[in-house]
From Swiss-Prot:
Subcellular localization, as worded in the UniProt entry: Mitochondrion
Protein name: Small ribosomal subunit protein uS3m
Species annotation: Penicillium urticae
Keywords in alphabetical order: Mitochondrion, Ribonucleoprotein, Ribosomal protein
Organism domain of life: Eukaryota
Any one GO biological process: translation
Family: Belongs to the universal ribosomal protein uS3 family.
Role noted for this protein: Essential for mitochondrial protein synthesis and required for the maturation of small ribosomal subunits.
Disulfide bridge map: none
């Protein structure tokens, strides 16, 4: 019995000092409150808090409708075939938006949006392929000179003919002028056909750019202000790659599955586009927690307190700044329209979804909303088509 008590006393926990070398103290991972809960509220009116989830849902619908606005007449001019409204609504040529992060105070709402502007990238790529490379060539400059010389000669001859006709037939001056205008417009259309389409693309880019300007956003801000009865501030973050946000990563798959049912093909294309780099596991810095180095004698004499060195330490200790793995899953009625097969499930992944520092290094990590991993972004989208309902899930892991 005494041996059991002695063994318990030896194995019981004993307090140790912070400066003890056997203790490993690591930086604690602090995650923003908005990542933990999708909206953070600091308000005193209890009755207003009950309606905030419904209001935020309507506001997100309004914001998505604003960024999905398009000019059907102008877009149809850039196509040979007729542009149908149904296919335009499910087109991937749009501005993709994530779920909003709402921060409520007593008199203001701060809305953070992550945006991937696919429409702008598409138009810039088309301009580069079709026009910008053409304009740089010497052949194009020679053609412009030829159009100028030939056009001036034709205009001079036509002007002389019109003067003769107006002198001989003064009653028919208006008819001569209309025929002359028709001739001019036909000549301009033939000679500057490519430049006309170039101007259409420039107009589309201007409309896309105007959606992010304050003058056009003011109308949206006024509508959101009427819903919340508060001042509204937008923080729009433009993402370089679409796989940096799980909501934006899953939206193209949902839109493509509404058109056609090539599930595996779309999954492979989206997963292939995600670029994942090899992660080098770095040791956590314990230098700031060693209290012996903060003596008044040696603190000012240290060379390691330079701004570049401190910046390097801070950036190396930042968490969740690199994508380490992605996964997509589609399930539901993914067969063709008139087939009698049942629901299907298809998955594709790339990289690793594990939290590398906690699973391999054994470092402590926080948990979101009770059971969600801090390094994972998870999204579920439910949608319907003519065949039936289907769902899309997306995971993005970061280190």
């Amino acid at each position: 019995m005494l041996n059991i008590i002695k063994s318990k006393l030896n194995t019981t926990y004993k307090k140790k000092g912070l400066n003890d070398s056997s203790i490993a103290i690591y930086n604690r991972d602090v995650i923003p409150a908005v990542r933990n809960w999708k909206s953070s509220i600091y308000a005193y009116n209890k009755n207003a808090i009950n309606l905030i989830p419904i209001k935020s849902k309507y506001v997100m619908k309004l914001i998505k409708a604003y960024f999905n606005l398009y000019n059907l007449q102008l877009e149809s001019l850039l196509r040979k075939n007729r542009l149908r409204r149904r296919f335009r609504k499910i087109s991937t040529n749009r501005i993709f938006i994530s779920d909003g992060e709402f921060k409520h105070t007593n008199d203001k709402v701060n809305i953070t949006l992550y945006v991937y502007n696919k429409q702008k990238l598409n138009y810039l790529l088309k301009l580069k392929k079709r026009y910008l490379t053409l304009f740089k060539k010497a052949k194009f400059a020679r053609k412009l000179k030829l159009i100028k010389n030939v056009g001036l000669n034709i205009l001079c001859k036509h002007k002389q003919k019109s003067i003769l006709l107006s002198n001989l037939l003064p009653k028919y001056n208006t008819q001569v002028n209309t025929a002359q205008n028709i001739y001019y417009t036909r000549f301009i259309k033939k000679s500057f056909k490519r430049l006309k389409f170039y101007m259409y693309y420039k107009q589309m880019l201007y409309i896309n750019k105007a959606k992010f300007e304050n003058t056009y956003l003011q109308g949206l801000i006024n509508l959101v202000r009427n819903i919340f009865n508060k001042n509204v501030e937008f923080n729009i973050i433009n993402l370089k790659y679409f796989y940096f946000n799980s909501k934006i990563f899953t939206q193209p798959l949902e839109l493509k599955l509404k058109k056609k049912r090539n599930v595996l093909r779309y999954l492979k294309v989206l997963i292939r586009k995600a670029k994942i780099k090899n992660v080098k596991l770095a040791e956590k810095s314990k230098k700031f927690f060693n209290f012996n180095i903060f003596n008044s004698d040696n603190f000012l004499q240290q060379d390691n307190t330079k701004s570049k060195y401190l910046k390097k330490i801070i950036l190396s200790n930042l968490k969740y700044k690199r994508v380490s793995g992605v996964r997509l899953e589609a399930a539901g009625r993914l067969t063709r329209r008139f087939s009698a097969s049942r629901s299907q499930r298809r998955t594709k992944y790339k990289g690793n979804l594990e939290n590398v520092y906690s699973s391999f290094k054994g470092y402590p990590t926080p948990v979101l909303r009770g059971n969600d991993k801090a390094n994972l972004q998870y999204t579920v989208i439910n949608s319907t088509s003519r065949v039936g309902a289907f769902g899309v899930k997306g995971w993005i892991s970061s280190t």
